[in-house]
Amino acid sequence: MKKRGGRILWLVYLDSTIPKSRGRIIAKGVAVPKPTIQEVEEALRRLGYSYESYPEKKYPPLWFEERARGYFLVKSDEKPASIAAKVAEEIRRIRGQ
């Protein structure tokens, strides 16, 4: 999703424990289990993206689940799936997987 000159990256997009039918946008093998706001923020920083963080917001289709909390507005023209795959890969490096 594009918003105010950037791309929205919900934590749900990266979460391997959430099925694609509920919001994940990258392959399960690429996604990471239960990413945190801090991990995604660190990954975006390491990858050199400019971003804004909205940790209190909930992914509308999963408003009732705590793990669906938080999104980032990434200043980029790349597709969200491309950004999500890079961030997931960086989170794997951070976790040492």
Curated annotation (Swiss-Prot):
Q: Name one GO cellular component term.
A: signal recognition particle
What is the protein's name according to its record?
Signal recognition particle 19 kDa protein
Which pairs are disulfide-linked? Answer: none
The lineage's top-level taxon is Archaea
Function, as annotated: Involved in targeting and insertion of nascent membrane proteins into the cytoplasmic membrane. Binds directly to 7S RNA and mediates binding of the 54 kDa subunit of the SRP.
Localisation: Cytoplasm
What are the protein's GO molecular function terms?
A: 7S RNA binding
Q: Source gene?
A: srp19
Sorted UniProt keywords: Cytoplasm, Ribonucleoprotein, RNA-binding, Signal recognition particle
Q: Which family does it belong to?
A: Belongs to the SRP19 family.
Q: GO terms for biological process?
A: SRP-dependent cotranslational protein targeting to membrane
How does this polypeptide assemble, per the annotation? Answer: Part of the signal recognition particle protein translocation system, which is composed of SRP and FtsY. Archaeal SRP consists of a 7S RNA molecule of 300 nucleotides and two protein subunits: SRP54 and SRP19.
Q: Which InterPro entries match?
A: Signal_recog_particle_SRP19, SRP19-like_sf, SRP19_arc-type
Tell me one Pfam family matched here: SRP19
- Where is it mainly found? cytoplasm
